[in-house]
Amino acid sequence: MLQVKIVPVTAFAQNCSLVWDSETKEAVLIDAGGDASVLKKEVEALGLKVKALWLTHGHLDHAGAVGELAKEWSVPVIGPHKEDQFWLDMIQEVSARYGFPIPQPVKVDQWLEGGEVLKLGEDEFEVRFAPGHTPGHVIFYNKNHGLLWTGDVLFKGSIGRTDFPRGNHEQLIESIKRECFSLPDDTQFISGHGPMSTIGYEKQFNPFVAGKAG
C-alpha cells in the first residue's frame, strides 16, 4: 500500500513528499529541498529505507538537501529533465543570494524524459514533462491512487512563477493544459507549496487557467 507524508521544508515551506510502500518500507523522497536533519528524523521514525531521491525541478527549495542525503544514504538522484542542469549547477550561488545554508552539490544520476515510468514497489509513477516554471520541470503521476505531484507547475488557486531565468508563461499554461488537465477530474495533486487540490477544482476555479482545459 502506498503511503505519503508531506514534510514542509525551508523558509519557503516547500512540500517535500516522503512516499513509501507500507509492506516493504522502501521509500523515495520527492523534492528534498532542505532541512536534511528533519527529513532524516522522519525516515528513521517511520523505519523506512530510502531508495532514491526524485526531483521535479532544480530550484534550491526543492533540491537543497539532495546532495547531502544522496551522499549519506548512497542513493541515486533521479530527475528532473536535463534542461534544468543549469539550475542545479547554480544551487550554491543561488542559495547564498537568498541567505539559505550553502548546500552540497547535486549530481543527477538519471535525467528524466516525459513518458518514462518510475517504480516504487508495485506502484508506477508516470513522468510527465511540464516546462514553463523551469525549462526542465517534470511532474509525477500515480494512476493507481489518482495522485499527482506537480512541483511548482500548478497550485491550489495559482500557477508557478515564470519570471526566473528561462521561465516561460505561455509554455507553463500549455504544460498545465496538456499534462495536468488531461488527467481525471478527481486526481488529487500535491504541489510544491500550499494545500492539496484536485484537477477538477482547478479546471473550474483556478483564475489563471480555469476554462483552458481544451
Features from the language model and the residues they span:
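Conserved beta-strand hairpin/beta-sheet module of binuclear metal-dependent hydrolase folds
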Residues: 1-46, 139-151
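Metallo-beta-lactamase
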Residues: 93-94, 117, 124-213
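Short, glycine/acidic-enriched loop or turn micro-motifs at the edges of active sites
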Residues: 24, 34, 60, 84, ...
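Active-site HxH/HxHxD metal-binding segment of metal-dependent hydrolases
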Residues: 35-119, 123, 204-211
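Short Gly/Pro-enriched turn/cap motifs at secondary-structure boundaries
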Residues: 7-9, 107-109, 129-131
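Active-site neighborhood of phospho(di)ester-bond hydrolases with catalytic His/Asp-centered motifs
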Residues: 29-30, 51-58, 77-81, 129-132, ...
